[in-house]
């Protein structure tokens, strides 16, 4: 079996530790592939797509830690984050006070220990369209509870 080098970090990768991209380049599963979202399709992506996605996640994670995490803890209801439901493997949050939306993926090293958060942050202006569904159900006390499910469609441009 031929060994290849990772196109991003230069590490030598073998058959079980490589991920082949659409343009024929290889990336390592141990380091570089873990820097992307799990829902990101690496098989159909090129090297440029993967590096742009990794840069976007690094920048989005910094913005998440600097702006969104303090807003999660605020007591002001107008600045509080709103969660977007309906996304499969990522959690979405909208910050009405800043005009930003974030999609995060939480990863754990073991069970609930060693949590790391990866985030992609977009402007609300990048939202092209969305579909929402309102579901009404009754809880255990007999009160009506409404759950809003939102499916956003974004114009994926990097945040500047």
Which residues does each PLM region occupy?
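A general secondary-structure signal for short beta-strands and their flanking turns/coil
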Residues: 1, 117, 147-151
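N-terminal cysteine/histidine-rich coordination modules
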Residues: 1-61
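Surface loops and adjacent helix of pleckstrin homology
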Residues: 18, 104-106, 132-135
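Hydrophobic beta-strand residues in large extracellular and virion-surface proteins
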Residues: 28, 101, 152-156
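Secondary-structure transition/turn motif
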Residues: 30-33, 104-108, 159
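Anionic N-terminal interaction surfaces
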Residues: 41-111, 116
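Short coil-to-beta-strand transition motifs
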Residues: 116-128
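Acidic, Ser/Thr- and proline-rich intrinsically disordered linker/docking segments
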Residues: 128-160
């Amino acid at each position: 079996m031929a060994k290849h080098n990772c196109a991003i970090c230069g590490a030598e990768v073998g058959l079980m530790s490589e991920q082949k991209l659409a343009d024929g380049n290889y990336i390592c599963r141990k380091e570089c592939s873990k820097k992307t979202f799990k829902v990101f399709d690496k098989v159909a992506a090129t090297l440029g797509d993967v590096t742009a996605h990794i840069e976007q996640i690094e920048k989005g994670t910094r913005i998440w830690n600097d702006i969104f995490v303090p807003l999660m803890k605020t007591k002001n209801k107008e600045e509080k984050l709103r969660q977007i439901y309906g996304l499969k493997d990522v959690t979405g949050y909208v910050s009405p006070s800043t005009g930003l939306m974030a999609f995060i993926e939480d990863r754990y090293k073991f069970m609930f220990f060693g949590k790391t958060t990866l985030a992609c942050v977009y402007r609300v202006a990048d939202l092209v369209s969305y579909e929402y569904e309102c579901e009404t159900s009754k809880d255990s006390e007999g009160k009506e509870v409404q759950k809003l499910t939102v499916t956003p469609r974004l114009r994926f441009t990097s945040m500047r």
